[in-house]
């Protein structure tokens, strides 16, 4: 389902787009619903457990997002080579991606395991002792899983790059089913609490990584590692990957560090606010499923278009995918808006936490419809064209000026509480949207030489 042989016609038929998108939609739905189920299961242990998992997951996401930026770089390079019909270099770039991910994730995991308590103290400062105890347990086991989630993300990105999103969907299914089954057994069956939740996540990620690496070696896969020697680090393909991966990693890293700063601010509002924020973040991802789906589809579609030299088609498909994201976001957010009073009852929150959670999610529903797709789906088109430095610059500046600084002003000066934290995020979205729309309209993002 890669680009067609004749570049004069459409590179992706409606059927090809549908075949790419529906597994991504199912994969995102699985990921979000299973993530919510994970939160629900941990919630049974108490608010301290929910708070600890929420805090550590914000740190986990920081680390995983930085490392997964390498997967984005590899996917962009591979998709452009596939668009050019150069399967040999596409395969070599895939092998180099696996090497870089393997080395970097092991190194980061070891550091986090050795310094787990120190890192938590530096990032989150003084928190309740029960929360810290649970957090250290969860973080230590999470660090063991970094190499496996890294290899899974790399393999999934490469399968999407060639238009085969079914494999990444199946890997996600394997990972999430094992995670939920493991939670049921370890949390409820053996009473292991937070440790059980972390072990279930680890086991799921191990199976997902093994599955996707096994599928990678299928003889019909154009991005399979053909020779063991291809895994030996080589300068040119690594530099190509890093040309996208480093700016994207810095962007993701600074974005998540900013979120951690905001999480530290949220932690000063009390356990109820931490729990409300954790559940609001979890529930809001339901409404983001259509947007995340189209964001994942954007990189392989636009990457192959630009690899084939079809700039007009790149612009056209970007508009189609962004429009689809907005339409889906409108429907999902409208549904969540009306269902939220019922949904919040699933999470065993106190009355105060439930009220805070419902309030911020309702505001999220409104802003997401108008600004999420242009903040997060559109920049993936720019990245697919090699414009990662621009998206990095905008994201970092907007994040720190608006989401971080404004959040502190809203909370500390105007005493808006958790609502102030979320309004800082909404204003960040508005700034990003304006910058990315202007950049896209000018067309400079298509002028980069990536391969």
Task: Report residues per predicted region.
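Short alpha-helical transmembrane segments in multi-pass integral membrane proteins
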Residues: 1-24, 78-145, 189-246, 302-368, ...
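N-terminal transmembrane alpha-helices
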Residues: 8-40, 44-45, 61-73, 77, ...
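Transmembrane helical elements of multi-pass membrane transporters/channels
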Residues: 19-38, 141, 175, 204-208, ...
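Helix-terminus/linker motif at the lipid-water interface of multi-pass membrane proteins
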Residues: 29, 33-51, 120-129, 185-192, ...
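Small-residue hotspots at the loop-to-helix junctions and early N-terminal turns
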Residues: 47-58, 135, 139, 198, ...
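Small-residue-rich hydrophobic transmembrane alpha-helices
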Residues: 50-110, 149-168, 274-340, 371-396
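Hydrophobic transmembrane alpha-helices of multi-pass small-molecule transporters
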Residues: 62-65, 179-183, 209-213, 286-289, ...
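Short runs within selected transmembrane alpha-helices of multi-pass transporters and secretion channels
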Residues: 71, 141-160, 168-176, 197-212, ...
């Amino acid at each position: 389902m890669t680009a067609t042989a004749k570049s004069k016609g459409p590179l992706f038929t409606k059927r090809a787009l549908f075949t790419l998108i529906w597994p991504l939609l199912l994969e995102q739905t699985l990921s979000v619903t299973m993530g919510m189920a994970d939160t629900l299961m941990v919630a049974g242990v108490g608010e301290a457990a929910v708070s600890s998992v929420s805090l550590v997951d914000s740190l986990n996401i920081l680390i995983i997002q930085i490392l997964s930026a390498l997967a984005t770089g590899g996917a962009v390079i591979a998709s452009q080579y596939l668009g050019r019909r150069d399967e040999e270099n596409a395969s070599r770039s895939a092998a180099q991606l696996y090497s870089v991910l393997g080395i970097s994730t092991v190194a980061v995991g070891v550091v986090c395991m050795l310094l787990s308590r120190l890192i938590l103290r530096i990032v989150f400062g003084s928190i309740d002792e029960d929360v810290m105890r649970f957090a250290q347990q969860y973080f230590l086991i999470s660090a063991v899983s970094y190499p496996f989630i890294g290899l899974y993300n790399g393999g999934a990105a490469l399968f999407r790059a060639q238009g085969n999103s079914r494999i990444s969907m199946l890997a996600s299914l394997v990972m999430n089913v094992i995670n939920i089954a493991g939670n049921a057994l370890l949390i409820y069956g053996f009473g292991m609490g937070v440790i059980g939740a972390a072990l279930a996540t680890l086991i799921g990620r191990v199976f997902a990584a093994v599955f996707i690496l096994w599928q990678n070696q299928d003889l019909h896969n154009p991005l399979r590692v053909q020779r063991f020697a291809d895994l030996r680090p080589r300068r040119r393909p690594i530099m190509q990957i890093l040309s996208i991966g480093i700016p994207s990693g810095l962007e993701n890293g600074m974005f998540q560090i900013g979120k951690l700063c905001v999480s530290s601010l949220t932690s000063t509002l009390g356990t109820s606010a931490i729990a409300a924020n954790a559940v609001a973040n979890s529930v809001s991802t339901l409404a983001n499923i259509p947007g995340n789906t189209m964001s994942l589809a954007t990189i392989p579609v636009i990457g192959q278009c630009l690899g084939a030299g079809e700039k007009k088609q790149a612009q056209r498909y970007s508009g189609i995918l962004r429009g689809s994201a907005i339409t889906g976001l409108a429907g999902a957010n409208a549904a969540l808006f009306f269902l939220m009073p019922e949904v919040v009852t699933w999470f065993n929150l106190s009355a105060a936490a439930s009220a805070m959670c419902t309030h911020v999610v309702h505001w999220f529903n409104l802003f997401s419809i108008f600004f999420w797709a242009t903040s997060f789906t559109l920049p993936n088109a720019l990245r697919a064209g090699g414009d990662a430095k621009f998206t990095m610059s905008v994201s970092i500046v907007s994040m720190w000026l608006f989401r971080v600084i404004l959040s502190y002003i809203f909370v500390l000066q105007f005493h808006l509480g958790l609502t102030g934290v979320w309004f800082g995020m909404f204003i960040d979205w508005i700034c990003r949207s304006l910058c990315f729309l202007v950049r896209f309209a000018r067309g400079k993002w298509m002028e980069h030489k990536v391969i």
